[in-house]
Amino acid sequence: MTEAQTACPTTETPVAAPVAPRWRVADVIALYELPFNDLLFRAQQTHREHFDANAIQLSTLLSIKTGGCEEDCGYCSQSAHHDTGLKAEKLMEVDAVLAAARTAKENGATRFCMGAAWRNPKDRHIEPIKEMIRGVKDMGLETCVTLGMLEEHQAKALAEAGLDYYNHNLDTSPEFYGQIISTRTYQDRLDTLERVRDAGINVCCGGIIGMGESRRERAGLIAQLANMNPYPESVPINNLVAIEGTPLENAQALDPFEFVRTIAVARITMPKAMVRLSAGREQLDDSMQALCFLAGANSMFYGDVLLTTGNPRAEADRKLLARLGMSATEATQLSA
């Protein structure tokens, strides 16, 4: 044998080449800047490849612990840093949450989301929340919770309870984030999302537009979401509700066509995700909501209140879907 043949094999691991992002911010901006009809046509084509274009999932959101949050998110009425007149409340009893879930199901919802205004839950909170999750799932409803930042063992505990989705929004682009929040870093959010993913829970992650950000910064948010590996299974898009007493109470209202564009861009860049119309629907008239469905939104939050802000009344939503010939279903992906 030659010296080369008898030499010990190397133990060094080859360094992998950096993976290029699927979507550069410039690419997302290019989508935003397409003529409106072209953008919606492309989004609708993408939507039909993966979903029934006339199916909408109805989700109901319940605030299970309201107010007193330690974070200083500039848009939020529940922050203890802002004087919005909202009184802090304790975590709801399990039976009360399950009663609300039953009502939501009776009203046509197939997804029930539970939100708590915490920076992060204490371990003592996890057990009653697990009971809520199990009880809601026993009703045949899809479950989602949003509790703030999670530790690894907390994410695993929620997964053991059968949680379907954990919501933890990025809110905006990394570049604009510091103008909205100072008490939690962008990386804090990404770390929680990684723990959720590692625990085997589906990720629900989106953001809020209309906070004074530029189109480039909106594109930065979409690129950040779309470049996650994998991208979120659920992407809620919120239209800012300017709440008196918050730093963003005087924010200029977003052009509704820009909101529709954002829905379309989210659909194109994350084709298999549930794209959800979330807070701020009250600011969109029926025609604009119809355009959002055309752009690829296939879920909406349903009921009179989202956490602490108003929402179109359930009866109005049912009438709108009927006028459009759309049906309230689970809007599951088409089979391959």
Swiss-Prot record:
- Answer yes or no on keyword rRNA-binding: no
Q: In which pathway does it act?
A: Cofactor biosynthesis; biotin biosynthesis; biotin from 7,8-diaminononanoate: step 2/2
- InterPro entries registered for this protein in UniProt: Aldolase_TIM, BATS_dom, Biotin_synth/BioAB, Biotin_synthase, Elp3/MiaA/NifB-like_rSAM, rSAM
List, alphabetically, the Pfam families matched. BATS, Radical_SAM
GO BP annotations of the record are: biotin biosynthetic process
Free-text cofactor note: Binds 1 [4Fe-4S] cluster. The cluster is coordinated with 3 cysteines and an exchangeable S-adenosyl-L-methionine. Binds 1 [2Fe-2S] cluster. The cluster is coordinated with 3 cysteines and 1 arginine.
Q: What does this protein need as cofactor?
A: [4Fe-4S] cluster; [2Fe-2S] cluster
Q: Which annotated residues bind [4Fe-4S] cluster? A: 69, 73, 76
Print the keywords alphabetically: 2Fe-2S, 4Fe-4S, Biotin biosynthesis, Iron, Iron-sulfur, Metal-binding, S-adenosyl-L-methionine, Transferase
Could you tell me which cysteines form disulfide bridges?
A: none
Q: Which catalysed reactions does the entry list for this protein?
A: (4R,5S)-dethiobiotin + (sulfur carrier)-SH + 2 reduced [2Fe-2S]-[ferredoxin] + 2 S-adenosyl-L-methionine = (sulfur carrier)-H + biotin + 2 5'-deoxyadenosine + 2 L-methionine + 2 oxidized [2Fe-2S]-[ferredoxin]
Residues the entry annotates as binding [2Fe-2S] cluster: 113, 144, 204, 276
* EC number(s) stated in the UniProt entry for this protein: 2.8.1.6
What terms describe the molecular function in GO for this protein? Answer: 2 iron, 2 sulfur cluster binding; 4 iron, 4 sulfur cluster binding; biotin synthase activity; iron ion binding
Q: Which intervals hold domain Radical SAM core?
A: 54-281
Q: What does this protein do?
A: Catalyzes the conversion of dethiobiotin (DTB) to biotin by the insertion of a sulfur atom into dethiobiotin via a radical-based mechanism.
HAMAP family on file: BioB
Family of this protein: Belongs to the radical SAM superfamily. Biotin synthase family.
The cross-references to NCBIfam families, in alphabetical order and at most eight, read: bioB (TIGR00433)
Q: Which PANTHER family match?
A: BIOTIN SYNTHASE, BIOTIN SYNTHASE, MITOCHONDRIAL
Q: How does it assemble?
A: Homodimer.
Q: What is this protein called?
A: Biotin synthase
